[in-house]
Amino acid sequence: MNKKFKKIVTEKKLTDAERIKENSNYLRGTITDDLKNEITNGFTGDNFSLIRFHGMYQQDDRDLRIERNEQKLEPRYAMMLRCRLPGGVIKAKKWLKIDYFASKYTLYGTIRLTNRQTFQFHGILKKNLKDVHKMLHSIGLDSLATANDVNRNVLCTSNPMESLIHQEAYEWARKISNFLLPHTKAYAEIWLDQKKIVTTEKEPILGKTYLPRKFKTTVVIPPYNDVDLYANDMNFVAITKNEKIIGFNILIGGGLSFIHGNKNTWPFLATEIGYISVENTLSIAKAIVTTQRDWGNRTDRANAKTRYTINNFGLNEFKKEIEKRANVNLKPVREYSFISRGDRFGWIKDINNNWSLTLFIQNGRIYDDNNKLFKSGLLKIANIHDGNFRITSNQNIIISEVSEKNKNKIEKIALSSGLINKSTNLRKNSMACVSFPTCPLAMAEAERMLSFFITQLENIMLKYGVEDEVIILRVSGCPNGCGRSLLAEIGLIGKSIGRYNLYIGGNRIGNRIPKIYKENITEQEILMHLKYLIKTWSNERKNKEDFGDFIVRKEFVKEVINPVYDFWS
């Protein structure tokens, strides 16, 4: 361990987030008191932060802020709740209750699929919070540990069951998720009215003050990188033999968030540290998490994530500590490769001779309007489907395990409701975070602007004869990384209302960070620059060269090799 760094950290004052966790009585705080408080629709003091451990964020409608302020009213507070759903798999019949709650008890009446393979409700009033938790509990779900300083929802390759390996990987995602869950009974006591039992509580893995920052985990089946593993703290890449997982390559320390103008923050790709046999999976997971728990920076949240811990102590020191704690020697990484990270749309037959239908849901927003009946269409499918829904890391949904007798029925519903539609490859490979009006951190539009922006970019691609090509395009309303723009070939990151930084030069499979090309420019200025770049790409690329690879080869931006040094240079 770097003793100099340890001394510097321990001499600094801990962040207020650490005080909140220390004093929370294992995440209870005074949340129950706030639930009884009818004077405000929000949570007060430390509870504002503590509810995140229970899977909720307090938000308000930013479109209404000025109006409500003029009326001397508090902001229209409501909660966003994120379900814990390892691997994104949910029985179709459970969707019926999810749809009902969204329609009856949320302000917006929609369901949002996320790029972490789960769903969110936006606009839940405080008075309805217990109802949503009890509804989730009734169908075997919860929202524990989907936010704040814990291991978040565990991702898993979501392409349909083409082999037994897919089911095995999903089971590992579930095991890891359950293994790393908080042990506190606070969630059940507060939201499910379970009686408190007087015991001495402990958190054997996470500790009393939990982790220094959020922590993200994936289970991956090559050659598909649909989970964007390089953006995550801890990754298990399946190595198989005779249709069975025999072990995992381990990659650690990925993450994309940074702070505008703060050169001590930077994105970083997850790094290989070795291979383990499958029986060592949970012990290695525990070792990685507890090393980050103990070594992570609790004095500066901007430098508290795993990638900064590894940078501060060195990868070799971090690796040695993992091996020591797990009592496992990491072996050399086994060969693997990736060919894509997009979803494969349409029908695919699985190993049981059933079918899976992958549907494109732009930005993951499930709603009905005059042109799209996504919400009612999925509800109709859920009513007749005996299998699962699988939410993908690209914010889409798979109707899986469809029997031959139901295939035509489901296809007719999907067609009539617009769930099966003709979209360009550009649109199908795009993504945006939620941003306005509900995200308090948003600096610029993301979800609400993306569709219109893509339409203009589609026209440019059509003009230059590349309309059928794939370009990975992503938009984030701020630099926190939720839209994973910093693993895109074209990434927009909000700077202020109507203005973005334009990043280019990522690649198709998601293992190269793009670099800033233009700063603080408008949508029209972005389109002007992209028009020139796409025209040049169309005329000068070699052998069907991908857009991001062309950008780097022609040196429109320099390749980001070590982001610690060259992300900002």
UniProtKB/Swiss-Prot annotation:
Which NCBIfam families does the annotation name?
CysI, PRK13504.1
GO MF annotation list = 4 iron, 4 sulfur cluster binding; heme binding; metal ion binding; NADP binding; sulfite reductase (ferredoxin) activity; sulfite reductase (NADPH) activity
What is the protein name for this chain? Answer: Sulfite reductase [NADPH] hemoprotein beta-component
Role played: Component of the sulfite reductase complex that catalyzes the 6-electron reduction of sulfite to sulfide. This is one of several activities required for the biosynthesis of L-cysteine from sulfate.
Q: Which residues bind [4Fe-4S] cluster?
A: 433, 439, 478, 482
What pairs make up the disulfide bonds? none
What organism is this sequence from?
Buchnera aphidicola subsp. Acyrthosiphon pisum (strain Tuc7)
Give the E.C. number(s). Answer: 1.8.1.2
Enumerate the residues binding siroheme: 482
Q: Which family does it belong to?
A: Belongs to the nitrite and sulfite reductase 4Fe-4S domain family.
Q: Which cofactor does it need?
A: siroheme; [4Fe-4S] cluster
